[in-house]
Regions:
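Active-site-adjacent bridging/hinge elements
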Residues: 63, 124, 150-155, 209-223
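Stable alpha-helical elements in mature extracytoplasmic
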Residues: 3, 77, 81-88, 140, ...
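Hydrophobic helix-coil surface modules that form long, contiguous segments used
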Residues: 1-149, 190
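Active-site-adjacent structural elements in folded domains
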Residues: 109-111, 138-143, 215, 221-231, ...
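Zinc-dependent metallopeptidase catalytic helix centered on the HExxH motif
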Residues: 83-86, 91, 127-201
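Amphipathic alpha-helical substructures
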Residues: 98-100, 187, 191-193, 225, ...
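Flexible glycine/proline-enriched surface loops and loop-helix/loop-strand junctions
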Residues: 1, 72-74, 161-162, 221-229, ...
């Protein structure tokens, strides 16, 4: 659900505070201390990051300031994150309807448990380890840019449109992962889109299908998946392939107008979006019954109907895996 937040906190005067909403005032209280006052519009969470040595830079996108916050020594990565955040916001504003807030902050944060990014309203945590061009990011081209696009897309799918992330995780994570590749398509062209889709969706799904734990249903509660690996592959990769298949069937105008209508219907709403809501929005936009296609990708484990082991072999060859 959405809420309005009115938050006051007292911190050392030289600390930087990055928070959901907008800062209304900052006033001195005790020696060396400041009271900071933040208020938000309708958002689903309130989060803040406090640091004593953040640096920042920003770019305007329409009526929004996109600001990157980074640690000393990470200026290169921080500037790239700012640029990619602005580019992603521009693309998604056009495709899904305008981002409604005046600020979007991308913050370098040390994350654990394998996370590269975490979404919050108006604030995106970006894994600090990936700001440097280390061996991992060199091995996976465009990795950090993909993470940024994914997290920016969450401002629509989780931020504006709320869903039950436990029961139907694919509604935000799968859709967000798919439209992150659409960002590459819009910004760089069809070849980069295909590469990102093959690397991030098709390869992990086919590897699980033919060299891992097999297929599974996408739309099930998070703790019903047999392992974290199966959860990640189904919710982030197979679900994204499902949205790509739907787009292929209904065509771009219907697909993107359906997503925009879905976002508009649930923006700031106390209603929680369900899989049926998204399917109906795409059906209304396209004039097609998508029940069979939807069930095939999200409610069944029928991947062997679509792919063979030879597809995995060829894909690995193509990607140089």
């Amino acid at each position: 659900n959405t809420a309005l937040f009115d938050v006051r906190l007292t911190v050392p005067s030289d600390f930087v505070v990055v928070a959901t909403g907008e800062e209304l005032s900052a006033r001195k209280t005790l020696p060396g201390m400041m009271e900071r006052h933040f208020v938000s519009g309708p958002v689903r969470d309130f989060v803040l990051v406090i640091d004593d040595d953040f640096q920042s830079d920003s770019l305007p996108v329409g009526g929004t300031t996109v600001r990157s916050w980074f640690n000393p020594g990470s200026a290169n990565g921080g500037m790239n994150v700012m640029l990619w955040g602005a580019q992603s916001l521009t693309v998604f504003n056009r495709l899904f309807g305008p981002y409604p807030y005046t600020e979007l902050d991308l913050v370098q944060v040390d994350l654990g448990n394998g996370a590269a990014g975490v979404e919050f309203p108006q604030i995106l945590f970006i894994g600090g380890d990936h700001y440097a061009a280390d061996a991992y990011t060199r091995r996976i081209p465009d990795f950090l840019e993909f993470v940024v696009a994914h997290e920016v897309a969450h401002q629509w799918w989780y931020g504006l449109v709320g869903n039950n992330q436990y029961l139907h995780a694919f509604l935000d994570e799968g859709l967000t992962n798919y439209v992150a590749t659409v960002y590459f398509e819009e910004e760089y062209g069809a070849e980069r889109y295909a590469y990102q889709a093959n690397l991030n969706f098709k390869l992990p799904y086919l590897a699980m299908l033919f060299a891992g734990e097999g297929d599974a249903i996408v739309d099930q509660p998070t703790d019903s998946f047999p392992s974290q690996n199966v959860y990640g592959t189904m919710v982030y990769a197979k679900a994204a392939l499902g949205f790509a298949a739907i787009r292929s069937v209904v065509g771009d105008p219907a697909f993107f107008s359906g997503l925009e209508a879905y976002a508009d219907a649930f923006a700031f709403s106390f209603a929680i979006a369900t899989p049926d809501d998204l399917r109906h929005a795409l059906e209304q936009a396209s004039g097609q019954d998508l029940t069979e296609l939807w069930n095939h990708w999200f409610e069944a484990a029928e991947g062997l109907q679509d792919f063979s082991p030879d597809d995995l072999t060829q894909l690995r060859r193509d990607l140089g895996d």
